[in-house]
């Protein structure tokens, strides 16, 4: 999930889930994609949805480039 530290609005866990489901439903070739995603989330503007997506992409790129260490999970054995 995208960090909200630079976002102009806060996102609830429910809104994040709706956002993720809408991204899966409306791919990059969908006409009026961002408007449809904003409607699916509800309470967010098209610009807020685009910004949230940009933050998500940046987070994914940071993780994939190794900027964040992999979590160390406790062994349960």
Curated annotation (Swiss-Prot):
The yes or no answer to whether the keyword Transcription is present is yes
Predominantly, its location class is nucleus
Q: Which tissues is this chain's protein expressed in?
A: Expressed just outside the vascular bundles in the rosette stem and the leaf traces. Not detected in floral primordia.
> What would be one Pfam family of this protein?
Myb_DNA-binding
InterPro entries assigned to the protein according to its UniProt record, in alphabetical order: Homeodomain-like_sf, RADIALIS-like, SANT/Myb, SANT_dom
- Record localization: Nucleus
Tell me the GO molecular function terms.
Answer: DNA-binding transcription factor activity
Keyword terms of this UniProt record: Nucleus, Transcription, Transcription regulation
Sequence ranges assigned to domain SANT in this UniProt record: 6-61
What CDD domains does the record point to?
A: SANT
Superkingdom of the organism of origin: Eukaryota
- Check the record and name the SUPFAM superfamilies matching this protein: Homeodomain-like
The entry's cellular-component GO terms read: cytosol; nucleus
Function noted in UniProt = Probable transcription factor.
What PANTHER family does UniProt report for this protein, alphabetically?
Answer: MYB FAMILY TRANSCRIPTION FACTOR-RELATED, PROTEIN RADIALIS-LIKE 4
Miscellaneous note, as given in the UniProt record, is: Assigned as a member of the MYB-related gene family, I-box-binding-like subfamily.
Protein name in the entry = Protein RADIALIS-like 4
The root-end lineage is: Eukaryota, Viridiplantae, Streptophyta, Embryophyta, Tracheophyta
Q: What is this protein's gene name?
A: RL4
